[in-house]
């Protein structure tokens, strides 16, 4: 049985999701949207993403993909591969969200059951990109537009059967 999971990401118009270990913008309300969607779920991330966050995300089970596990803590597990992380996440009765970074998105996007994508209405320099994907493989089910300190739009896609 295939594990059902969603990718969630914020990117600039030019697909940048990071610069070094930082997000190259602050869009008021965007992180609250991320929190609302992922709270209560299981989040899967690469080591660099975990290091940039600096701690496990609260109110979520955190799974970090790394070749060098650091030991487990409450609501925090380490796995050596994407496949192992998805297997572990499937045993936890919660929605599963892949939250980055670029390499992890690239390895999981083709089998995602849903995408939660926020596009910040700016072009920025960076070194971590959200991968291109076949939009015809997904149905767009929701779009929301926001204007705070920056304009951004949220799109929710589900995979076609």
Task: Label every PLM stretch briefly.
Residues 1-161:
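Enzymes that bind and transform nitrogen-containing heteroaromatic metabolites
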């Amino acid at each position: 049985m295939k594990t059902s999971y969603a990718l969630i990401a914020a990117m600039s118009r030019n697909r940048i999701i990071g610069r070094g270990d930082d997000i190259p913008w602050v869009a008021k309300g965007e992180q609250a949207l991320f929190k609302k969607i992922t709270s209560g779920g299981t989040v899967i991330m690469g080591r660099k993403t975990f290091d940039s966050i600096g701690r496990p995300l609260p109110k979520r089970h955190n799974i970090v993909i790394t070749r060098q596990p650091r030991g487990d803590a409450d609501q925090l597990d380490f796995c050596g591969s994407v496949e192992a992380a998805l297997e572990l996440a499937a045993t936890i009765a919660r929605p599963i969200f892949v939250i980055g970074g670029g390499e992890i998105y690239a390895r999981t996007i083709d089998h995602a059951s849903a995408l939660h994508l926020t596009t910040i209405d700016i072009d920025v320099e960076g070194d971590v990109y959200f991968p291109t994907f076949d939009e015809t493989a997904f149905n767009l089910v929701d779009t929301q537009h926001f204007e705070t300190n920056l304009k951004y739009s949220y799109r929710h896609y589900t995979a076609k059967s």
